Each structure stands twice: as C-alpha cells, then as structure tokens.
Amino acid sequence: MTQAKKQPTAPQEATSNDDTIIEELLANIPSTEDIVLELPSKNKFYTLMDPTKPITIRPLTFEDEKKMMSSKQGGSKMLNSLLGSCIKNINLSQVLQLDKLYMLMKLREVSYGETYQAKINCPSCKNDNDITFNLSKLPVNYIEEEMVNPVPVYLPVLQKTIKVKLPTIADEGYLVNSEIAMANLWRFVTEIEGHVNKRIISQVIQKLPLKDAHALLKVMGGDGLGIDTKVKFACSYCPLVEDMELPIGADFFTDS
C-alpha cells in the first residue's frame, strides 16, 4: 500500500509579531541605499536621464550574485550586466572607460567592504602572499574643468593636431585586443587638421608613425585620468618590493 505524498503547505500569513521579529533579525543588515558617485569625468560629458539628480550606485544583492554565478557570460559582458543593474541615472552605453573602472571599484567596495584580499605569487621567491588592499585608498585623478571631448591631440611626428573621442562602454567591441584596436583607431578620430571626412581620416590613421599612434592611444587610455589601480607589493618572504596592478581575479566580486 503506497503512502500518499504530503502536499507542501504555504507559509502562514505573517502577523505583526512576525514582522517585528524579522525586523530585529535583520537589524544589522548593511545599507542598500543608493550612493552618489563622484566620477573621474565629473559627469561632464554625459546626458543624464534626470539632469537634476546625480549618478548613483547600489550594493550588489544576493539576487545579483546568484545571477552572476549562473550567468554564462564572462568578462566585460558580465561586468556590464552588473553595472547595468546597480547604476542609476545614466545610459550605461555612454559611460567612459575611465569612469567604468572607477564604477567597478566602487561597486565592489559598497557591496563587500573597502578591503580586498588577494593571493599574490612572488615573482622572485615564488612564495604565495596573502595581501589585503584597501579599495577606498586608491587615488582618483579627476578631469580638469576645461577639458573637452573629443580631445585635441598633437602628433609629434606628423606635426598635426587631431581630435579623438574618449572610448565608452559602447565602443568595447572595437577594443577587444590590440590588433582590433589598432584596426579601429580611425573610428575614434573625429578630425585631423580640420578635415572630418572619414575616408581621409582612415587613410591617415593607417599610416601613422608609431610614435604618433602611441600618442593617440595614450589619450584614449585616459592619459592618467580615473582611478589609479597601481599598488605596492612587498613580499613577506623575501626583500622584493615593487609596484603592480591591483590583481583583479574571478573572485573580485565575491566576499574575499
């Protein structure tokens, strides 16, 4: 004789006492309020959804983390998806790359705290070091008030001035790797000595001397603007001390 399966029962309706208990149990939950972002660009080149309000960010939620863990997306697509869920008052596609990195650092900071632990293998003695970094201490270089976009760039070899627009999240497909980036440099140049014809621009950019190409790439890369992710690494096992990029691994958006 088979025993009938018990049907799952729904939780009973909450009472006022239940609500009080739940509120007490969650008393120490971190704030999920939106935090105003002081972007390196100072919002200077953006058309905000509501010009009377700032750009804000909220901490990641458990739901966000579940989506991240189950997502088949990786790299920039996954990071953009996270930012799209947490950033308010701006169309994500127009966010400058120099602001995106700042946003990612702040998203990690407001979600898990200002400290970030990473395991670094010493290039000298090969020992693993457990290092704690303080994300809130990373210096930020803000743009000058007089800066414009597109940015005028003087090419030292050609002795000509061009204007180049700063890359945004929408441009990431043109910057996947160095080969693709070099082939698409012309897309970011809006003017060469007053000439705006894209055919002329494309032909000139293809023939740029290396020094001039590097001058162009330097500006596109932010030229020192934005959050500085260079940190000092001091090995605990040997005398090595060196500057390095903040080691951002797959666990950056976890509670490490």
Please report, for each region that a protein language model flagged, where it lies by residue:
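Long C-terminal interaction/binding lobes of large macromolecular proteins
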Residues: 1-256
